[in-house]
Amino acid sequence: MRLLGLDVGSKTIGVAVSDPLGITAQAVMTIPIDEDRHNFGMRSLKKLVREYEANGFVLGLPKNMDGTAGRSVSRSKAMGERLEQKFGLPVYYDDERLTTVASERILVEEAGMHDRRQRKEVVDQMAAVLILQNYLDLQRKE
């Protein structure tokens, strides 16, 4: 089962894809969005669903550190509903607490990306990888 992992933000969506066996996640791209113009990246996502023959989506659920729903939870849930309606594929959610912080740390410490502008281009993709990989790991444990 091949899944697309999404890190949904206010201006971009980071995208990752699982391998066909559902073991590893790899970064794919960052899709610009414009909520004010109702551009939610569906055209790009449609191409990715076809290209990777995706069977579903995993979206990050931005909870607060105490486990309560963060302000952006409604954005992720609304995107999940749009995806279900548009593609008819299942949408799963995974706790995304600290994925952006972890992504920044990985990019600086392991990839040597000290330029903030350079990191900005890939941090959403890395967050999507962490969201999807966490989901895949949890599924294998069950």
UniProtKB/Swiss-Prot annotation:
GO terms for biological process: rRNA 5'-end processing. CDD domains: YqgF (cd16964). GO terms for molecular function: nuclease activity. InterPro entries: RNaseH-like_sf (IPR012337), YqgF (IPR005227), YqgF/RNaseH-like_dom (IPR006641), YqgF/RNaseH-like_dom_sf (IPR037027). One of its GO terms (cellular component) is cytosol. NCBIfam families: RNAse_H_YqgF. Could be a nuclease involved in processing of the 5'-end of pre-16S rRNA. PANTHER family: POLYNUCLEOTIDYL TRANSFERASE, RIBONUCLEASE H-LIKE SUPERFAMILY PROTEIN (PTHR33317:SF4). This is Putative pre-16S rRNA nuclease. The lineage of its organism: Bacteria, Bacillati, Bacillota, Bacilli, Lactobacillales.
